[in-house]
Structures are given as structure tokens and as C-alpha cells.
């Protein structure tokens, strides 16, 4: 059972998922580098003239790979979010069972007191 979260609009849901770039492997570089300033410095220093120019792109393959990686990361985060919701649901069920057990113990204690009260 997944609980509806009406306050979590699509925009906010996606905003929560988009910081997923931190899930990229630490050794990866390039467009998804953890240090965009260093990436820009690499681009300008490789040109030699100090002017900011965009790196040459192939026929969309780099962009396609980037989108595929982003989609993969979003899917991973969605799975984690669903597991979190299921875990929360399980925690609520466990808490409800604990409360039921406590209530039954209290009823048993009262019943035993009423039976043993005359002795």
C-alpha cells in the first residue's frame, strides 16, 4: 500500500530526484563531473587561448549517453523512494501491532487482577 502524498507535486518530486548527480561514480569526469569549475578550466586550458568555447560534440551520442545515465539514476532513485515508502509502511504496521499487544497485555493484567482481587 503506497500512501498518497498530495503535497508532493510532480515538480517537487523531480526536484528531489534531480540532485542525483552525487550518485555518479567518484572517478567519473566529463559532463557529469562533481567539480564543474575544474571541467570548465580543462576546456579553456585545452584551447590555449583562455576563451570559453564549447567542446566539440559528436552527432548527439554524448547527449544520448548523458540522458541515458540521467534516466538510469532517476530510476534508481525512484526504486529507493518506493523502498523507503514500503519500509515506512512496514514501520507503521509494526507500531500498530505493538500498540495492539500493549492493549491486550493491559486487558490481561486487568482481568487477572479482577480474578485474583478476591484472594
From Swiss-Prot:
Regions annotated as coiled coil: 62-116
InterPro entries hit by this protein: MCCD1
Name of the protein in its database record: Mitochondrial coiled-coil domain protein 1
Range annotated as the organelle transit peptide: 1-24
Keywords, alphabetical: Coiled coil, Mitochondrion, Transit peptide
Organ and tissue specificity: Widely expressed. Expressed in adult and fetal liver, kidney and lung. Expressed in fetal brain. Weakly expressed in fetal spleen.
Compositionally biased residues, Polar residues: 31-52
Predominant cellular place of this UniProt entry's protein: mitochondrion
Region (Disordered): 25-65
Subcellular location, record wording: Mitochondrion
GO CC annotation, single: mitochondrion
Amino acid at each position: 500500500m503506497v500512501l498518497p502524498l498530495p503535497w508532493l507535486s510532480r515538480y517537487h518530486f523531480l526536484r528531489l530526484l534531480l540532485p542525483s548527480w552525487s550518485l555518479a561514480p567518484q572517478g567519473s569526469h566529463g559532463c557529469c563531473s562533481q567539480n564543474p569549475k575544474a571541467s570548465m578550466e580543462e576546456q579553456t586550458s585545452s584551447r590555449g587561448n583562455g576563451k570559453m568555447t564549447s567542446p566539440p560534440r559528436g552527432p548527439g551520442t554524448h547527449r544520448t549517453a548523458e540522458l541515458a545515465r540521467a534516466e538510469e539514476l532517476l530510476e534508481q532513485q525512484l526504486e529507493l523512494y518506493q523502498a523507503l515508502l514500503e519500509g515506512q509502511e512496514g514501520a507503521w504496521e509494526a507500531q500498530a501491532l505493538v500498540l495492539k499487544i500493549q492493549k491486550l497485555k493491559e486487558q490481561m493484567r486487568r482481568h487477572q487482577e479482577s480474578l485474583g482481587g478476591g484472594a
